[in-house]
């Protein structure tokens, strides 16, 4: 059963301007170490670095909407991180207030699954997040 849906669309150049203006302070405040490492692996192409950050920013916004809180009520930027599953499919790794909110939304006898779709087509980045409750496997 679906327990939350969120989407976000962002101008990649806007993210680039914020990074230029605030640099490390912005990056440290918003992105996890894993997200920063992924973006910086693309360092040979500045547009790809900024697009990588923009897609992750959009995914965090979409996830916060799917959680029903936005970036408030104890859910903060670094509580949500885009990670890739072994097959490469993106998902969200939640901690802190975001994880607490997810646990509160997930009914007993179910586990949460977070599906993420991220894309970019310069100058836009977009993300969709669907949070589902999946019945626990019977032992």
Swiss-Prot record:
Short name of one Pfam family: ACPS
Catalytic activity entry: apo-[ACP] + CoA = holo-[ACP] + adenosine 3',5'-bisphosphate + H(+)
GO cellular component: cytoplasm
GO biological process, one term: fatty acid biosynthetic process
An example molecular function term from Gene Ontology annotations: magnesium ion binding
Principal EC category: transferase
InterPro entries registered for this protein in UniProt: 4-PPantetheinyl_Trfase_dom, 4-PPantetheinyl_Trfase_dom_sf, ACPS, Ppantetheine-prot_Trfase_dom
Cofactor(s) the protein requires to work: Mg(2+)
Record EC number: 2.7.8.7
Subcellular location: Cytoplasm
Binding site for Mg(2+): 8, 61
Source taxon at top rank: Bacteria
Mitochondrion is among the record's keywords: no
Keyword annotations of the record: Cytoplasm, Fatty acid biosynthesis, Fatty acid metabolism, Lipid biosynthesis, Lipid metabolism, Magnesium, Metal-binding, Transferase
Family, as annotated: Belongs to the P-Pant transferase superfamily. AcpS family.
Function (record text): Transfers the 4'-phosphopantetheine moiety from coenzyme A to a Ser of acyl-carrier-protein.
Database matches in HAMAP family: AcpS
Protein name in UniProt: Holo-[acyl-carrier-protein] synthase
Organism: Bradyrhizobium diazoefficiens (strain JCM 10833 / BCRC 13528 / IAM 13628 / NBRC 14792 / USDA 110)
